[in-house]
C-alpha cells in the first residue's frame, strides 16, 4: 500500500491539483467553509484553545484558518543571544552535519546542499561542513514560520520544481525530494555567520509567502529567480528572533543550514521529536 501511495504521486497532475486546491482554500463559501474547518479541526485534532480566534466562524476562507494567528504569549521566545529557537511548530525529520556537501533526507537517501540552494555552488560553499535540520509541519500544526535568531536578509531565491508530498513516507521513498520540490530559499547574515531558511513546497501547498515580499508562489514557472537585499537602509529586511518571516498555505517543510562550527544542536533534538516555535533549537558555539 505504501508503494502505491508513493507511486501515485509520480502520476497525478501535481501542479494542476495544487492550483485547484489553492483556489478552493481561498474561496469564501460561508457555512460550507465553516463546516470544512470544523471537520479539519476534528480530523487532525487541532488545538484551537491557543488560537487568537477560536471560533471557526471567524474565518472567511480555509486559508485564513490554516494560517491562523495565535494568542499573544502562546509561544514565548527563549531568551538569550546565544540561544537559537525553533522556527515552527513541527516535527524533527532529520538533523546533523553536512558531510561532503550532503544532507540526510531519510535512511538511505541523501541530497546536496548545492541542489537545495538552487545550484549555487558559491552559496553552498558557505555551508561546507556545517549543520542542517529538517522540520516537517503536519496538517494540525501552526503554519507560520518565524526567525530562529536575529538576521539580516541577504538574498531570496525561488527555485521551481515538483510538488511531491513531504510527509515521512514520501521522504523515505522519493530520492532527492527536498532538492526537487519547489522551494523558497532565504539567506540571512547573523552574528554567527550565514543561515539559510528554506521553505519547501509540496502537493496542495497553494502558496508560500514572505512577510517582506508577500506571495512568492504562485505564479509558478520554470526559472530560478534571485532577489538581493541591502544590509541597511529603507529596503533592508532585518528581523528579530521570533518574528514571523513566512507562512505556508497549506503546510510543508522548513530546512535550516548553518555554517561550520557556528552552532551545536540542543540536547532535546531527536529525529521524530515534536518542536514548538520559540523553544531552544541550538546554541551558538
Curated annotation (Swiss-Prot):
Is synthesized initially as an inactive proenzyme. Formation of the active enzyme involves a self-maturation process in which the active site pyruvoyl group is generated from an internal serine residue via an autocatalytic post-translational modification. Two non-identical subunits are generated from the proenzyme in this reaction, and the pyruvate is formed at the N-terminus of the alpha chain, which is derived from the carboxyl end of the proenzyme. Belongs to the phosphatidylserine decarboxylase family. PSD-B subfamily. Prokaryotic type I sub-subfamily. The keyword DNA repair does not apply. One of its GO terms (molecular function) is phosphatidylserine decarboxylase activity. The gene is psd. The active site is at 89 (charge relay system), 146 (charge relay system), 252 (charge relay system), 252 (schiff-base intermediate with substrate). It comes from the Bacteria. It is found in: Cell membrane. Its EC number is 4.1.1.65. Its main location: membrane. Catalyzes the formation of phosphatidylethanolamine (PtdEtn) from phosphatidylserine (PtdSer). This is Phosphatidylserine decarboxylase proenzyme. Heterodimer of a large membrane-associated beta subunit and a small pyruvoyl-containing alpha subunit.
Amino acid at each position: 500500500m505504501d508503494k502505491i501511495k508513493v507511486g501515485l504521486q509520480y502520476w497525478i497532475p501535481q501542479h494542476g491539483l495544487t492550483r485547484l486546491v489553492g483556489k478552493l482554500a481561498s474561496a469564501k463559501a460561508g457555512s460550507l467553509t465553516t463546516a470544512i474547518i470544523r471537520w479539519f479541526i476534528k480530523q487532525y485534532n487541532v488545538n484551537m484553545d491557543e488560537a487568537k480566534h477560536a471560533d471557526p466562524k471567524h474565518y472567511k476562507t480555509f486559508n485564513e484558518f490554516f494560517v491562523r494567528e495565535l494568542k499573544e504569549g502562546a509561544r514565548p521566545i527563549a531568551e538569550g543571544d546565544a540561544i537559537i529557537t525553533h522556527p515552527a511548530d513541527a516535527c524533527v525529520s532529520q538533523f546533523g552535519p553536512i558531510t561532503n556537501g550532503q544532507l540526510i533526507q531519510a535512511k538511505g537517501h541523501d541530497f546536496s546542499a548545492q541542489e537545495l540552494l538552487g545550484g549555487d555552488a558559491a552559496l553552498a560553499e558557505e555551508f561546507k561542513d556545517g549543520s542542517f535540520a529538517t522540520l516537517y509541519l503536519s496538517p494540525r500544526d501552526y503554519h507560520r514560520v518565524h526567525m530562529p535568531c536575529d538576521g539580516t536578509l541577504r538574498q531570496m531565491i525561488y527555485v521551481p520544481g515538483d510538488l511531491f508530498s513531504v510527509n515521512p513516507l514520501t521522504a523515505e521513498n522519493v530520492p532527492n525530494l527536498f532538492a526537487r520540490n519547489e522551494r523558497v530559499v532565504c539567506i540571512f547574515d547573523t552574528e554567527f555567520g550565514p543561515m539559510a531558511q528554506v521553505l519547501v513546497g509540496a502537493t496542495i501547498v497553494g502558496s508560500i509567502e514572505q512577510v517582506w515580499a508577500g506571495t512568492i508562489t504562485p505564479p509558478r514557472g520554470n526559472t530560478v529567480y534571485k532577489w538581493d537585499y541591502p544590509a541597511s537602509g529603507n529596503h533592508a529586511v532585518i528581523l528579530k528572533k521570533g518574528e514571523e518571516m513566512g507562512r505556508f498555505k497549506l503546510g510543508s517543510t522548513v530546512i535550516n543550514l548553518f555554517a561550520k562550527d557556528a552552532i551545536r544542536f540542543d540536547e532535546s533534538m531527536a529525529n521524530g521529536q515534536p518542536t514548538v516555535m520559540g523553544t531552544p533549537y541550538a546554541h551558538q558555539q
